Swiss-Prot record:
It catalyses: L-glutamyl-tRNA(Gln) + L-glutamine + ATP + H2O = L-glutaminyl-tRNA(Gln) + L-glutamate + ADP + phosphate + H(+); L-aspartyl-tRNA(Asn) + L-glutamine + ATP + H2O = L-asparaginyl-tRNA(Asn) + L-glutamate + ADP + phosphate + 2 H(+). Its EC number is 6.3.5.-. Transmembrane segments: none annotated. Allows the formation of correctly charged Asn-tRNA(Asn) or Gln-tRNA(Gln) through the transamidation of misacylated Asp-tRNA(Asn) or Glu-tRNA(Gln) in organisms which lack either or both of asparaginyl-tRNA or glutaminyl-tRNA synthetases. The reaction takes place in the presence of glutamine and ATP through an activated phospho-Asp-tRNA(Asn) or phospho-Glu-tRNA(Gln). Belongs to the GatC family. It holds the Pfam family GatC. The gene is gatC. This is Aspartyl/glutamyl-tRNA(Asn/Gln) amidotransferase subunit C. Keywords: ATP-binding, Ligase, Nucleotide-binding, Protein biosynthesis. Signal peptide: none annotated. PANTHER family: GLUTAMYL-TRNA(GLN) AMIDOTRANSFERASE SUBUNIT C, MITOCHONDRIAL. GO terms for biological process: glutaminyl-tRNAGln biosynthesis via transamidation; regulation of translational fidelity; translation. Heterotrimer of A, B and C subunits.
Length: 97
């Protein structure tokens, strides 16, 4: 692994459109160096025979049987509308003619 320089950090910051104060460049240089060293360690791990995964915990969809439930709340909903016209909600016009 090549050494990360202050110029490398400035370049990455510029690409990310970050304005880093000059007094923080040394800190970020060391942090980026450690991050990339860790990535090198991960690259060296033998993963032969390990199945690929996309998440740590299996996701299970909780499903239920659909069922029809008779409801008659139409009038209740219409009564709550701030403005209505017959059996329709009246809303402000948003598109020009």
């Amino acid at each position: 692994m090549s050494k990360i320089t202050a110029d490398d950090v400035r370049k990455v910051a510029k690409l990310a459109r970050l304005d880093l104060p000059e007094d923080t460049i040394a800190t970020y240089t060391g942090q980026l160096e450690r991050i990339l060293d860790y990535v090198d360690q991960l690259q060296a791990v033998d993963t032969e025979g390990v199945p690929p995964t996309t998440r740590a915990v299996e996701v299970v969809n909780a499903t239920r049987e659909d069922s029809v439930v008779a409801t008659d709340v139409r009038q209740e909903l219409l009564d709550q509308a701030p403005q209505r016209e017959g059996d329709f909600f009246r809303v402000p016009k948003i598109l020009a003619d």
